[in-house]
Design a protein with these regions (language model features):
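Bacterial N-terminal signal peptides that target proteins for export
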Residues: 1-9
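Bacterial N-terminal signal peptides
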Residues: 10-20
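Sec/Tat signal peptide C-region and signal peptidase I cleavage site
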Residues: 20-26
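Non-transmembrane domains of secretory- and envelope-associated proteins
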Residues: 27-134, 268-301, 305-306, 313-318, ...
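Solvent-exposed N-terminal domain segments of exported/luminal and surface proteins
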Residues: 32-244
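Extended beta-strand-rich segments in extracellular/periplasmic secretory proteins, especially
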Residues: 176, 195-211, 223-224, 279-350, ...
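An acidic-aromatic
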Residues: 221-224, 228-280
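Extended, compositionally biased non-globular segments
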Residues: 326-391
Length: 456
């Protein structure tokens, strides 16, 4: 183990040091590239020292979190200072599906960005396999790699996830407390892609697409809490990048379907803390933000979790999950500012793992540029979404099995588990199973009539 640990840390240090600028090239670079190199060099130095100070088997808590400040976001650090813990394990490679790798090799060479930062000539796979940090479009390319990640390519279903929301604080005797105010259970969350399909026919596109959408998503009906029973939403994301998403919210108690604006997608609904655009790290339109690359460096992330259901942290009363974290060789740090008037956040600072093109955490800032929220995502890799299920994938896939959103200013948090804590035998995730899978639904499930019918 000692020899293996030394190898992992050496590799991480080498990755960090590779970010430092080459003095012999500095004079030939434009000013923005010099600034990027300077920032990367400083980040690399801090990350190198921090990486050398940790090893697998360590537990990061509020007593020693300062030594990894350069390896986590300010939001993650705030969560640890509140009582969360990070158990350090060795780095492990993220498996990428063979079909996705083949599509990347076949199509990526033809992909470009237009003047509005929309993808052109993309068919399937990773749009930009290699990103030059000195490219003025680097941040946009990183976000498109995330937007077209291998996480799912055809369809996605989540059955019976549950979530709790409430205040977290120290009680009168100093005990960390998470006071749950509401418990949420939703029947289904489904997402159907019409483009970039790799695993089941029709592929790479669904030709029958009268709504001209890239994907459709449904989240309904809510089963709990009782006063929100039947509430749900349906969203369409269109092929045309200039067209706003259509998101319809149905509330049975007033028998009303309401259309949400793009700005309202940043609002946290029903007394909990996550907004529609924060699911998965970022679920908004990529061309509708101005993106800037802050840097790249090794950082810690939770990408190979072991616990199902996720392990609740006792140190903060249970508002976060105490899971395995590893030193990832390269994490991109990207800042995004919405072009939409009235958006709730002044900026999002998003951390994207280069190998997986996944977002393990992101920090959200208020209109005064103060840190407001942190989104923490726990990911695991397996050929089964849950060991109890009766189906397996031919390859390992990634599954988000837990996430937490902390409102650091209000002292309020929402945690979710997939599968839900009350349904430990449930698969939870159904990823790329195809239109003929037993749990599949007809196309008209993604519609307002279906939304209303399910909510009655």
């Amino acid at each position: 183990m000692k020899h293996r640990t030394s190898f992992i840390l050496t590799a991480a240090l080498a990755a960090a040091c590779s970010l430092a600028p080459n003095p012999s090239l500095a004079e030939t670079k434009p000013d923005h590239a010099k600034a990027a190199d300077s920032h990367a060099g400083a980040a690399a130095a801090g990350a190198s020292a921090a990486a050398a100070a940790i090893k697998p088997g360590d537990v990061i808590n509020k007593g020693n979190v300062d030594k990894v400040s350069d390896l986590i976001s300010p939001g993650v650090k705030a969560a640890v200072l509140n009582g969360s813990e990070l158990s350090i394990v060795p780095y492990a490679k993220i498996p990428i599906p063979k079909a996705y790798i083949e599509a990347t090799e076949k199509y990526s060479g033809q992909v470009t960005l237009d003047d509005k930062n929309d993808l052109k000539n993309w068919v399937a796979g990773r749009p930009f396999p290699t990103v030059d940090p000195n490219d003025p479009k680097a941040a946009v390319k990183i976000m498109w790699n995330f937007g077209r990640t291998s996480y799912f390519n055809d369809d996605l279903g989540v059955h019976l996830p549950d979530a709790d929301t409430g205040a977290y604080f120290k009680s009168g005797d100093g005990k960390p407390t998470y006071q749950i105010e509401r418990h949420f259970i939703v029947d289904w969350s489904r997402n159907l892609r019409f483009f970039g399909r790799l695993h089941h026919d029709p592929r790479p596109i669904i030709p029958d697409n009268p709504d001209q959408v890239f994907n459709k998503q449904g989240f309904f009906p809510l089963i709990e809490p009782f006063d929100l029973k039947g509430v749900g939403s349906v969203s369409f994301r269109y092929i045309d990048p200039t067209r706003q998403d259509d998101t319809w919210l149905y509330t049975p108690t007033i028998r009303r379907v309401r259309r949400l604006s793009s700005a309202q997608r940043s609002d946290a609904l029903f007394g909990q803390d996550i907004d529609l655009d924060s699911f998965g790290g970022y679920a908004g339109q990529i061309p509708w933000f101005d993106w800037k690359l802050i840097g790249q460096k090794p950082m810690l992330a939770s990408l190979h979790g072991k616990n199902l259901p996720p392990k609740i942290c006792p140190g903060d009363g249970g508002v976060t999950y105490c899971e395995d974290w590893e030193l990832r060789p390269k994490m991109w740090i990207v800042e995004g500012r919405a072009r939409v008037h009235g958006y709730a956040y002044s900026k999002r600072v998003i951390y994207v793992d280069d190998e997986a093109s996944m977002i393990p955490y992101s920090d959200l800032f208020d209109n005064n540029e103060e840190l407001w929220k942190v989104v923490l995502i726990n990911i695991r890799s397996s050929n089964q979404p849950n060991p109890h299920v009766d189906f397996k994938y031919d390859e390992e896939r990634m599954f988000v099995y837990g996430f937490t959103v902390l409102d650091l200013q209000l002292g309020h948090g929402t945690r979710a588990a997939i599968p839900g804590m009350a349904f430990p035998e449930e698969p939870g995730w159904y990823i790329d199973r195809g239109l003929q899978a037993p749990e599949a639904v007809p196309m008209d499930w993604y519609s307002i009539p279906s939304l209303i019918a399910a909510g009655r």
